């Protein structure tokens, strides 16, 4: 008899579309929740079980602590018992902050900083030799090189960039007889110090001695140095207050020389004041490169963005930031330049000489130009150098305070590696410290796989003392690297920015971090961890999930992957359909048991009763026309040449990190877009040549970014259906009688919307210790419109009622109105019949947003010359939804278009006409074309990881 506490018992769950369901989830097991997209899987896993677990934990904290945390709303459920503390690892990407990297998220970089601080050896950038500490005698010799009569201060830096009031330290200095301090750059009497803010960082130096250098000093200098070094833990500053007049010297007034008993280069004078973890942090002023402030990149005004289309003339607006020279001042400036340098502003910019272009962009230097400015009857003549477009933009960027103007100027900027730190983000002081000939920036730039290999041989290169100090640090680093390898992220580098990671990658990084934490007794809720993962790496991911379970945790995974289902201890199938047609528990048990449930669509596919069929023949394309990309070398691409047959369904495959997105999105898509839309601000990866663009008229990347940033955007507005709905309402007799225009039926502008909630339908109430509460607007009752607008009805329904309809209901309602029906039927075709047409864009998942975009494309009149690119369109899709999606994609191809998908899903790959397999591995070992051809060709290639798994699907 199984005891009750062996289950998480959910009773009466009614969140979103869940239909009062009861479910028992085995504790300390690996459980998969599956079902069609929109069936209610996430509603059960995240919005009910995780939300309640998190809410109970937060409610147990003090009210003071709760105000700093986001409180989950209480889910619509009668009871949940047996619940553990819950941790959600979802698809939302990690921080977009450029300072957040793979190394900082996983904490490996923190251990690396500690390792370098404790066993790293500093080397002089000038000589390449190890840096040794200075003795007091060596310091005296350096000071004696200053001209006689030089007035200096000897300073002991007792506080360097720390917060506090330092009352005790100052009291001790008083007792020792010191009279003067330099506090935050100001010389102060010790009895008359400014009050220090304990929450701000301060610098305090003791003036140990004030000396005028001459022969008669004797031992005074050495004694003062020793006192200063003792006060400041081996560091002292010498500040040159005054140099003797008429003496030529390399030294300067107010110059500071740092002396350290620790590290200093006697040849170049390069010194390290400390080797502490903070100097290896690019998020600390003590470690960050001063030029790029730890970002590793510099931004500059780019000539190609300032003049994106050189085919037009200056007069017609070639210089984009200066507009179409409509400003009289700008036009007269350019005319004066043209007269002086003998060029025309009416010819294409490309035909101007390189010298003229350089002068336009960078200025005329010291050469003065005669400018005539006319203001009515007045004429002003000025003779001065021309500043140049780029220097004038830089000056404007530096002096302007308007955020809007700064954003406008940013459109003309590109980025490149910081020239000071070579993109490593750190000061020279940090980059001169090395272990086994590598500085920390070089180590962070290695792939996880290369890093694991480097660390496995590192022990041989450390001496006994270093090994003793580093033993525990090395254990922590190698453990974390192993976990990252196990979740298929061996191709990432520690320096990779978090904002550039896909949802699947960031989720697996957090998964690896959780295993590293070693927690037990926790409920982990994961959202499709297999996304973005090649079938080859899936086994390692499943083993990782099992290891998490074996630590004594309950692992609850929302997943569609068949292999994961077969390996799970228990499966809960939610369905049978999506939206209102879902929300019930259809089947429970292991994979074999699920197969026997007739109502379970998942069971039908697992048992083979229903399948995605392999096409009987493959398309060959349009008259052998193709797009050819030659010599692609961005990121890890190794001088790649590819040919994409037009009029086909082409799949780009390969293991994670092999270079698929670099090839298709960063190079092909951006290069084609730049050619087809000259004003687009995109930066393609490097390539030699792109041929065949004359055969297409547009290239569209249908990605998973939101269809809108505000709750006002919805599927009806995005697809254009709402425009036709509003037009229809305007034509109704009652609307005409009242004189209503189209704006009357918009919730974005004044007129017809409810002004109490400004068309949102909800009013936000801020709660101090609780989450913000959204309540229905009591004026419009959540309908968004005012009473007069809602009085206009079609078939008994107001415009607010129509926005609340699902796509399926709206199709039936408008079946006699072709303009509206055609927009809605495409939403249904892509499997979104369950969503409400007025559903807020912010509540749509990435997969749903992508399919709304696909529906919009389907509803357009096809030219048959469009190239569509989709990056993993199966994200978040059940196998039955994938079947529907494939019909839509093949329909686009049948209309004459070309569809290019980057995909790991073998059910999609097997239906492709043509496959380009990139690899063979990820990272440095990828970036090559392994094989191209039909699915049968790929399956026959022994070197292709994709081919090996695809073979089983073709049999």
Swiss-Prot record:
InterPro entries in the cross-refs: ABC_transporter-like_ATP-bd (IPR003439), ABC_transporter-like_CS (IPR017871), ATP_grasp_subdomain_1 (IPR013815), P-loop_NTPase (IPR027417), UvrA (IPR004602), UvrA_DNA-bd (IPR041552), UvrA_inter (IPR041102)
A Pfam family annotated for this UniProt entry: UvrA_inter
Chain ranges of zinc fingers (C4-type): 754-780
Residues annotated as domain ABC transporter: 322-601, 621-951
UniProt entry tagged with the keyword rRNA-binding: no
Single GO BP term: nucleotide-excision repair
Main location: cytoplasm
Binding-site residues for ATP, renumbered to this chain: 35-42, 654-661
GO molecular function: ATP binding; ATP hydrolysis activity; DNA binding; excinuclease ABC activity; zinc ion binding
Gene Ontology CC terms: cytoplasm; excinuclease repair complex
Subcellular location field: Cytoplasm
Keywords: ATP-binding, Cytoplasm, DNA damage, DNA excision, DNA repair, DNA-binding, Excision nuclease, Metal-binding, Nucleotide-binding, Repeat, SOS response, Zinc, Zinc-finger
Role, per record: The UvrABC repair system catalyzes the recognition and processing of DNA lesions. UvrA is an ATPase and a DNA-binding protein. A damage recognition complex composed of 2 UvrA and 2 UvrB subunits scans DNA for abnormalities. When the presence of a lesion has been verified by UvrB, the UvrA molecules dissociate.
Protein family: Belongs to the ABC transporter superfamily. UvrA family.
NCBIfam families: PRK00349.1 (NF001503), uvra (TIGR00630)
Record's protein name: UvrABC system protein A
Organism per entry: Rickettsia felis (strain ATCC VR-1525 / URRWXCal2)
This protein's encoding gene: uvrA
